[in-house]
């Protein structure tokens, strides 16, 4: 396929905007984009309980427009590069999959649950809760874009003065400001816990729909087998899954017909005034615990993917690409989508298939049409979401592998340590979800079994992560423990009773205060899981950075990261939490399940920061012991650093040669 407007190369040849092999890239990237759109529709409904008017009227139109804009930009960038390299391949672009999960589980769902428990489970309360969740999600998306933009501008400045600084000094400064290893290592924990595990559970729960598509992807991803006619593995997996579901009678024509009610053009609207006008200082700080690391993820991911393209011979301006991506992410947030965009992994794959300039623009255009017309709802009832789960399982596994690959081999323990806070957060999410369900809060009335189908099946799938911003219970710090629920040890220590009233996170936390070990669930301290879950992304980054510096015997670097961890804990971005106290069915106040960040130490700046949502009806844990712990870390490492600098520290010999140490990438 050739274009009417070819791009000219220096040799007089022309680089067509579209070639026949662009179809391979189009179907492959298009399948990925379709999966993400289906996930947005399914998870927004099942996890955050957003109504259709928000999903199909605000979020998807903005997301589709962003995908189209990004792919058009990268197609134009490829046209420019084609003037010197005719076989150039455009960078693939789409919604950040990990960012999607982070926003859903760690910004929007916690905000929804907290507001619902504060406002009450009424029609008005639910609407206020979903609006608050959507608003905070969009704010977080814009915040991540701002972090990415500032980071890219800073790196551009460093690149500009590189000649004056010298290559080594510039490289060292960049690694100090942007430690890629620890950032990617923390991403690995999210990928394995909240992405891979979520979908693995569903794959094994629906083997008759998901296993054959899983086998297709195993063959294409791991064995690198080329399918007949060059069919992308993702596309074949979706087709096979749909065939199996329809063949088993799990999909229905009536559901497809009913979904046509959502079809119709939706014009994206500018929501800047609504989103930014509703911002309170505490909202910004609560979201910062997520959007700061999310912005760093996007920054590092975009840089690495653009650099990977350069290794394949397609050299795109790194700073320019990252800056444009940050602007598109900010735009999509202000247009109503909480989900950031990014350059996708896979440029080398599409280049190997022979795709060139036009494949991304075609895929982006189709995704935009589906999103802007509400057609995603129809497709969600034609293709079972379970058929797409193997794709997401591989995404999670690939990102985790990339996290370990971002470190030298000797830093493997540092990468492993970074997984711990994320796995603790995953465990807390399961505990919290169970308690909310047994209390009749998430699923107030049991539903009759429904067939596995499209977008609604996504909702029935995993009951993913609850998240950051979790309140605490009395007895954790500022207030004495005066539980309304069992004041004795009875019923708090052993099997949690399943009742309509349930037992709450607050009660389990207080039980731990009454008797060490009394607040355990399956052997795990709920308070400990909660402490690790608060700001776990920062905790993962700091653990990895500290460990990597210690492996390299860079004690002063480890001390620096320990001090930074103490500072963020003092602010309230890590470990500190508040559990709200809510009114039970009998009208009495009781320990709740709604947890939130608390910035009690910043009350001198703004009194509202010291009081979490719910006012005084909350118990606050300031994490002061953890601040002291990080300071002790810093003191120990500082002393060792001084001793080593003075040559008074005896070091054990390692098996790593000096040449390897000097050649390997250092964290700081």
Predicted regions and their residues:
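Low-complexity, proline/glycine-enriched hydrophobic segments characteristic of transmembrane helices
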Residues: 427-532, 575-621
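Membrane-embedded helical hairpins/re-entrant loop segments and their flanking transmembrane helices
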Residues: 13-17, 49-54, 69-88, 283-357, ...
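Hydrophobic mid-bilayer segments of alpha-helices in multi-pass membrane transport proteins
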Residues: 64, 186-187, 210-215, 231-244, ...
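N-terminal alpha-helical transmembrane segments of multi-pass membrane transport
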Residues: 1-95, 108-112, 570-626, 636-660, ...
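Membrane-helix interface "capping/anchor" motifs
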Residues: 76-85, 221-233, 352-358, 403-413, ...
């Amino acid at each position: 396929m050739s274009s009417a407007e070819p791009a000219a190369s220096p040799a007089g040849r022309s680089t067509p905007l579209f070639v026949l092999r662009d179809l391979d890239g189009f179907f492959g990237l298009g399948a990925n984009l379709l999966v993400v759109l289906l996930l947005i529709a399914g998870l927004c409904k099942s996890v955050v309980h957003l109504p259709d008017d928000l999903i199909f009227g605000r979020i998807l139109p903005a997301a589709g427009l962003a995908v189209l804009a990004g792919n058009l930009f990268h197609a134009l960038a490829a046209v420019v590069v084609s003037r010197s390299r005719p076989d150039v391949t455009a960078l693939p672009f789409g919604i950040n999959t990990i960012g999607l999960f982070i926003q859903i589980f760690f910004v929007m769902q916690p905000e929804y649950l907290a507001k619902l428990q504060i406002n009450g489970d009424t029609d008005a309360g639910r609407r206020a809760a979903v609006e608050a969740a959507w608003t905070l999600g969009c704010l977080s998306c814009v915040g991540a874009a701002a972090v990415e933009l500032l980071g890219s501008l800073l790196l551009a400045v460093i690149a500009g003065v590189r000649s004056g600084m010298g290559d080594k000094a510039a490289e060292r400064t960049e690694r100090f400001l942007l430690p890629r290893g620890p950032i990617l290592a923390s991403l690995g924990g999210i990928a394995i816990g909240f992405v891979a595990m979520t979908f693995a559970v569903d794959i094994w729960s629906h083997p008759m729909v998901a296993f054959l598509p899983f086998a297709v992807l195993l063959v294409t991803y791991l064995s690198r087998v080329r399918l007949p006619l060059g069919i992308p593995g993702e596309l074949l997996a979706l087709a096979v899954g749909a065939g199996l579901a329809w063949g088993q009678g799990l999909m229905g024509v009536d559901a497809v017909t009913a979904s046509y009610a959502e079809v119709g053009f939706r014009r994206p609207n500018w929501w800047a005034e609504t989103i930014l006008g509703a911002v309170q200082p505490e909202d910004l700080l609560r979201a910062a615990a997520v959007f700061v690391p999310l912005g760093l993820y996007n920054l590092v991911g975009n840089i690495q993917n653009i650099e990977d393209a350069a290794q394949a011979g397609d050299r795109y301006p790194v700073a320019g690409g990252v800056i444009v991506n940050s602007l598109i992410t900010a735009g999509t947030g202000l247009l109503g989508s909480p989900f950031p965009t990014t350059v996708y992994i896979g440029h080398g794959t599409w280049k190997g298939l022979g795709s060139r300039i036009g494949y991304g623009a075609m895929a982006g255009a189709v995704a935009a049409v589906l999103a802007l017309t509400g057609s995603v709802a129809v497709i969600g009832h034609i293709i079972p979401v379970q058929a797409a789960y193997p794709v997401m399982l591989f995404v999670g596994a690939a990102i985790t592998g990339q996290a370990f690959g971002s470190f030298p081999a000797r830093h493997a323990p540092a990468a492993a340590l970074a997984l711990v806070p994320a796995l603790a957060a995953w465990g807390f999410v399961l505990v919290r979800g169970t308690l909310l369900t047994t209390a009749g809060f998430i699923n107030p009335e049991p539903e009759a079994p429904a067939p596995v189908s499209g977008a609604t099946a996504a909702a029935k799938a995993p009951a993913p992560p609850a998240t950051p911003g979790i309140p605490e219970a009395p007895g954790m710090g500022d207030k004495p423990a005066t539980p309304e629920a069992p004041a004795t040890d009875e019923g708090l220590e052993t099997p949690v009773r399943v009742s309509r009233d349930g037992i709450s996170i607050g009660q389990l936390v207080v039980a731990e205060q009454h008797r060490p070990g009394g607040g355990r669930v399956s052997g795990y301290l709920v308070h400990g899981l909660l402490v690790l879950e608060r700001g776990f992304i920062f905790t993962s980054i700091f653990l990895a950075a500290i460990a990597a510096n210690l492996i390299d015997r860079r004690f002063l670097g480890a001390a620096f990261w320990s001090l930074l961890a103490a500072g963020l804990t003092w602010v309230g971005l890590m470990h500190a939490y508040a559990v709200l106290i809510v009114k039970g069915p009998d009208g009495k106040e009781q320990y709740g399940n709604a947890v939130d960040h608390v910035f009690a130490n910043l009350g001198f700046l703004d009194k509202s920061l010291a009081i979490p949502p719910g006012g005084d009806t909350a118990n606050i844990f300031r994490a002061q012991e953890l601040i002291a712990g990080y300071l002790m870390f810093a003191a120990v490492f500082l002393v060792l650093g001084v001793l080593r600098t003075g040559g008074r520290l005896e070091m054990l010999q390692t098996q790593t040669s000096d040449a390897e140490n000097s050649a390997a990438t250092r964290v700081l």
